[in-house]
Amino acid sequence: MFIKIDSIYDLISLISLFANLYFIFTMDIVLIIGCMFCILLHNIFKEITYGWYPPIFKRPNGATDCNLFNTGGLIDHKSGFPSGHVTSISFLMYSLLLKIGDIDFKNIILYNIPIMLVAYARIMKGCHNLIQVVAGYLLGYSVAYMLHIYKNEVNIKIDEIKTYISDKIS
């Protein structure tokens, strides 16, 4: 089977898969760039931290089926820092929150509910520890915030690239 669901924690973890699909189907280039940037940074951090201080960086003993589709087998020897699932959902939720612009206590709580659910599921599934999910949360938030600040510049550059390509084609 393409996606493996053995527990409620697997089901909750799939929220991150739906977040990644949302990035693609919205065709919002800033969200797509942010998603790719989150994936890139997340993978770089995992490669860099492999073999570092195990209580923080190594996945919990017995971690299995921890990839985006809840498959992949035993991976407890690999780095789990930061959590990619939490990174992607944190990026999505904070991108949406910053986009609506109504940042008050109620909205912060509401937009953090999916993030906390995924973080809890990743810990309970045994794929990450608390430090790893907090790092994923901060990474997703940081990318969302930086893209929000520089959104106009990113859109201008994208328009310049589109113009350049259309001029070359014509």
Give short role names for the model-derived ranges.
Residues 76-84, 131-134, 151-157:
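Short, Lys/Arg-enriched charge-dense amphipathic segments
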Residues 51-60, 117-148:
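Interfacial helix-loop-helix junctions of multi-pass membrane proteins
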Residues 1-81, 86-122:
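Hydrophobic alpha-helical bundle signature of multipass membrane enzymes
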Residues 142-170:
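C-terminal membrane module of polytopic membrane proteins
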